[in-house]
Structures are given as C-alpha cells and as structure tokens.
Amino acid sequence: MLRQFLFSTASRRLVRPMIAPHRSASSSLDKTEFTTPSQIVDYDDPPHLPVPEYPLRPDEPLETRKQRLLYQSRKRGMLENDLLLSTFVAKHLRDFSAAQTAQYDELINGVSNDWDIFYWATETKPTPPQYDTEIMRMLKQHVKNEERVQRIRQPDL
C-alpha cells in the first residue's frame, strides 16, 4: 500500500513543492535557476550552552602531540575541514617547532566551532586576533592552493 502511494500522482503533488528549485521571474519557464544565499547564516551560541574547556597537556612529548594533532586534523566531523587540515598537516606538521605545534593545537582545539576555522581559513570572515598567528597565515596560504593541487581525498598515513 505504501508503494502504491509513493508512486501515485497524489504523493507527487505533495512532495513536488518541497523539492522544486527556485525559479526566477526573469528566467523562461523551461530554464531552472538554482541560487545560493548571498550571506552566511551564522548565529551566536546561546549563553546557556556551556562550552567545555579543552584540557591543556603541558607535559605531552612533542612527537606524541604531533601524532594526536595528525589524528585530530583528519577527524574533524566536517569534510571541508578534514580535507583542508589533513592536507595542511601532511605538508607542514613534521617541520613545526614546539611553539608552532602549540599554536596549531590551540587553533584546532581552542575554537568551539569548526565552521569558524573554515571561514577564517577561506577568509570569508576576519580572523580574531588571538588566532591570527603564523600558523593561521600558513593555513590561509595553503587554502589558496596556488599550486592547484587536487584535494579530493585525505593524504595517506
């Protein structure tokens, strides 16, 4: 019975308005125009949501910290940052000093919203002064991809 309903014209009339693309008044009836919003929808977090503090690890050996950051750069929870940060780390992390590694750790673990990192790295939003470091400048340069390297998957481990 469900199959009959799904393939009936009544179900198509119900679903069509939900999936119909936007048609602009200037376009002809046979031409469909898909639009994207001109502004980023970004709301501040409500004050009643506690943001947990990331635990500092002052006694962590440098190699262990780099291994942890390699893992955390690959497993962000959003594909855009997974690709940007994993390729950035594959290219630069082994050459980072202890201070640069600490800056990168603060950048990816001190920010509570991964979209902020993405917007700062792509220069869609201005970077706050506390995160406008040498590492952020390197990340922005990496994101520009002046070498035109394909980044459609994460680098091998």
UniProtKB/Swiss-Prot annotation:
Function: Plays an essential role in the assembly of succinate dehydrogenase (SDH), an enzyme complex (also referred to as respiratory complex II) that is a component of both the tricarboxylic acid (TCA) cycle and the mitochondrial electron transport chain, and which couples the oxidation of succinate to fumarate with the reduction of ubiquinone (coenzyme Q) to ubiquinol. Required for flavinylation (covalent attachment of FAD) of the flavoprotein subunit of the SDH catalytic dimer.
Subunit comment: Interacts with the flavoprotein subunit within the SDH catalytic dimer.
Organism whose genome encodes this protein: Drosophila pseudoobscura pseudoobscura
Domain of life: Eukaryota
Keywords, sorted A to Z: Chaperone, Mitochondrion, Transit peptide
Pfam families: Sdh5
Protein's cellular compartments: Mitochondrion matrix
Protein name: Succinate dehydrogenase assembly factor 2-A, mitochondrial
GO biological process: mitochondrial electron transport, succinate to ubiquinone; mitochondrial respiratory chain complex II assembly; protein-FAD linkage; tricarboxylic acid cycle
GO-annotated cellular components: mitochondrial matrix; mitochondrion
Lineage of source species: Eukaryota, Metazoa, Ecdysozoa, Arthropoda, Hexapoda
InterPro entries: SDH, SDH_sf, SDHAF2
Annotated family: Belongs to the SDHAF2 family.
Transit pept. (range): 1-24
PANTHER family on file: PROTEIN EMI5 HOMOLOG, MITOCHONDRIAL, SUCCINATE DEHYDROGENASE ASSEMBLY FACTOR 2, MITOCHONDRIAL
HAMAP family: SDHAF2
